[in-house]
């Protein structure tokens, strides 16, 4: 079954007696699949203009008839996991420690200091996600949310040349947005629903996840509000990954903390920003750091199915690759 086949369109609610006007209201809020309806709380659905509690209850009931969303035999869960795919990082050693590459249906986070390859990895994945599956790709499009203005089309062209693909087509398949602030960043993810429901996207990149939040919420007095907003944002990203079977890839910054625990910090005491909220949302967590000379080191710190391990990679004209 293809990814497109696994997404049940929200338009199927019409067969259950829900009128087209109410369906369009859901779409305008970025809710474009039956799974999205089921995973959105009644409270949040009633916040959509024009949807009363009675209407929301009918919509929930109709969605529940189309797709069962309670206890299921584990065999069905196992079957759904067969749809998971991996996108190559460009390095065989890097892919190996990840169990095949960047995984769909979950969030992968990389964090590290300046010039360790976070954005270069994003650019490599933009091309890799479009490659055929036999080349480690996802044969699909990419959504790219840039919070720091570091996206460079010229890098995409260089990486496309490495893989022998048309650079213009590659760029055409990348849906790019520059996030202006944390509110805009949240809205961009919410607006993606209509495009993702088409089933042609394989990867969503946010580079970087915390940059706008750190600017908009700067003092300790605003930390609680920041973490609440971040939690909601990450919940939406998790839902996107699971509902549309795409890989969500986040880059993150680091900060110094000499008293940080080994779980969250690197050997030099630096830890990723975002706290426990981000740590729990990321299924896979990777630390990137500088190695000897031009070498970079990737350490898998947290994964639901792979042990802690590290590898060495380099950044070349064609993106991330193995050392010679």
From Swiss-Prot:
GO cellular component terms attached to this protein's record: condensed nuclear chromosome
Residues bound to ATP: 112-119
Annotated positions binding dsDNA: 214, 220, 226
SMART domains: AAA (SM00382)
Pfam families per the UniProt record, alphabetical: HHH_5, Rad51
Binding, ssDNA: 214, 217, 220, 226, 296
InterPro entries: AAA+_ATPase, Dmc1, DNA_recomb/repair_Rad51_C, DNA_recomb/repair_RecA-like, DNA_repair_Rad51/TF_NusA_a-hlx, P-loop_NTPase, RecA_ATP-bd, RecA_monomer-monomer_interface
Keywords: ATP-binding, Cell cycle, DNA-binding, Meiosis, Nucleotide-binding, Nucleus
Molecular-function GO terms, alphabetical: ATP binding; ATP hydrolysis activity; ATP-dependent DNA damage sensor activity; ATPase inhibitor activity; DNA strand exchange activity; double-stranded DNA binding; single-stranded DNA binding
Coiled-coil blocks: none
Compartment annotation: Nucleus
Highest taxon in the source lineage: Eukaryota
Biological role stated in the UniProt entry: Required for meiotic recombination, synaptonemal complex formation and cell cycle progression.
Family recorded in the similarity comment: Belongs to the RecA family. DMC1 subfamily.
Subunit comment: Double stacked ring-shaped homooctamer.
Protein name stated in the entry: Meiotic recombination protein DLH1
Naturally occurring in which organism (per UniProt): Candida albicans (Yeast)
Name of encoding gene: DLH1
């Amino acid at each position: 079954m293809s990814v497109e086949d696994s997404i049940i369109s929200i338009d199927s609610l019409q067969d259950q007696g829900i009128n087209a006007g109410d369906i369009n209201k859901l779409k305008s809020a970025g809710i474009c699949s039956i799974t999205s309806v089921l995973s959105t709380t009644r409270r949040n659905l009633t916040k959509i203009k024009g949807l009363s509690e009675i209407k929301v209850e009918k919509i929930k009931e109709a969605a529940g008839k189309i797709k069962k969303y309670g206890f299921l035999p584990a065999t069905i869960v196992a079957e759904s996991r067969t749809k998971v795919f991996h996108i190559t990082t460009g390095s065989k050693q890097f892919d190996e420690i990840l169990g095949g590459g960047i995984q769909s249906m979950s969030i992968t986070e990389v964090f590290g200091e300046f010039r360790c390859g976070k954005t270069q990895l994003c650019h490599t994945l933009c091309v890799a996600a479009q490659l055929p599956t036999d080349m480690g790709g996802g044969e699909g499009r990419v959504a790219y949310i840039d919070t720091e203005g570091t996206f460079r089309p010229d890098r995409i062209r260089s990486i496309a040349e490495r893989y022998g693909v048309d650079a213009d087509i590659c760029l055409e398949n990348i849906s790019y947005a520059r996030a202006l602030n944390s509110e805009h960043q949240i809205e961009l993810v919410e607006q993606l629903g209509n495009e993702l429901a088409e089933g042609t996207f394989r990867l969503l990149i946010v580079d970087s996840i915390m940059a706008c939040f750190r600017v908009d919420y700067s003092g300790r007095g605003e930390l609680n509000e920041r973490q609440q907003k971040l939690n909601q944002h990450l919940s939406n990203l998790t839902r996107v990954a699971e509902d549309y079977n795409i890989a969500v890839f986040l880059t993150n910054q680091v900060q110094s903390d000499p008293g940080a625990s080994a779980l969250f910090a690197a050997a030099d005491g630096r830890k990723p920003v975002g706290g426990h909220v981000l740590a729990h949302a990321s299924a896979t967590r990777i630390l990137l750091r500088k190695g000897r000379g031009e070498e970079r080191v990737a350490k898998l710190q947290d994964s639901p199915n792979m042990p802690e391990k590290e590898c060495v990679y380099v950044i070349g004209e064609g993106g991330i690759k193995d050392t010679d």
